[in-house]
């Protein structure tokens, strides 16, 4: 029986997708491409076995296990998770949150209360049904941030803001399973991710011409930090500690 994998087709996951599709493990897995929020819900309800999961949703998954030392993280500006606003930070009174990712929404709430010292009204926003208003304030994630972020007069990189606040890198998503998997399969899965990381230049081809090829490669190599290092684990633990009680970490770490 194939292992069911929920993956995300944002540019920042391109190396992972390339690795899983072009490694021998492709014969052992069934990949479905969904949004971050759907990836999390599929692991929560048991319709997927592995997923690249926004970190705010990981504690909601029963028997969650982080199974890889690869992640979607940032040691500096991430460029693809942004607060984009028509007004300066201290004037923001309403902030629209992307329903595709629980992590960016929770990060916005934590930074608003503890670092930015603002108290906006938060409202969900469905980008597939509504158009952006450049006079308003939004959290943009993934390819939407890369495409539309530069249109706004005030842009704040969420990873940079977290680093200013905590002096720790930020982790946006990890590879998680909701069940115990054979160690040999996990090793092969990680080898596939490693193969993708070794082929970043090839991995971006599916996103051209939507993104300029050189820009896409530079973004993946400069803005995204894929190694789930000790500092990133510390940053992730700190993020979970600031979350509501129901999101306190109950997660088993890989290794």
What kind of region is each of these model predictions?
Residues 1-3, 251-255:
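Short, Lys/Arg-enriched, disordered terminal segments
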Residues 4, 30, 65, 119-121, ...:
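Conserved beta-strand segments of alpha/beta enzyme cores
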Residues 42-44, 132, 243:
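Hydrophobic residues within well-ordered alpha-helices
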Residues 181-242, 246:
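Secondary-structure end/capping motifs
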Residues 1-22, 80-135, 234:
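Bilobed "Venus flytrap"/periplasmic-binding protein-like clamshell domains
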Residues 11-91, 99-100, 104:
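Short, glycine-/small- and polar/acidic-enriched structural segments
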Residues 124-206:
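Pocket-lining segment of extracytoplasmic ligand-binding domains
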Residues 24-32, 115-125, 248-253:
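A local structural motif
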């Amino acid at each position: 029986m194939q292992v069911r994998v929920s993956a995300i087709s944002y540019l920042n996951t391109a190396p992972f997708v390339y690795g899983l599709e072009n490694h021998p493990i492709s014969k052992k897995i069934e990949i479905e491409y969904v949004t971050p929020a759907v990836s999390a819900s599929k692991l929560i309800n048991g319709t997927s076995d592995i997923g690249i999961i926004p970190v705010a949703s990981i504690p909601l998954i029963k028997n969650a296990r982080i199974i890889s030392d690869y992640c979607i993280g940032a040691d500096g500006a991430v460029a693809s998770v942004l607060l984009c606003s028509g007004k300066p930070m201290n004037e923001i009174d309403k902030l629209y949150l992307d329903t595709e990712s629980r992590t960016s929404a929770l990060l916005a709430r934590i930074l608003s209360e503890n670092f930015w010292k603002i108290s906006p009204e938060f409202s969900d926003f469905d980008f597939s049904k509504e158009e952006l208003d450049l006079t308003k304030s939004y959290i943009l994630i993934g390819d939407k941030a890369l495409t539309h972020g530069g249109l706004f007069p005030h842009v704040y990189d969420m990873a940079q803001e977290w680093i200013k606040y905590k002096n720790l890198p930020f982790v946006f998503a990890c590879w998680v399973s909701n069940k115990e998997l054979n160690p040999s399969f996990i090793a092969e899965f990680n080898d596939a991710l490693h193969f993708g990381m070794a082929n970043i230049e090839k991995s971006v081809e599916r996103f051209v011409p939507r993104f300029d090829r050189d820009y896409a490669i530079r973004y993946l190599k400069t803005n995204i930090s894929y190694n789930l290092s000790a500092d990133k684990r510390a940053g992730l633990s700190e993020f979970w500690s600031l979350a509501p009680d129901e999101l306190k970490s109950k997660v088993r770490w890989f290794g």
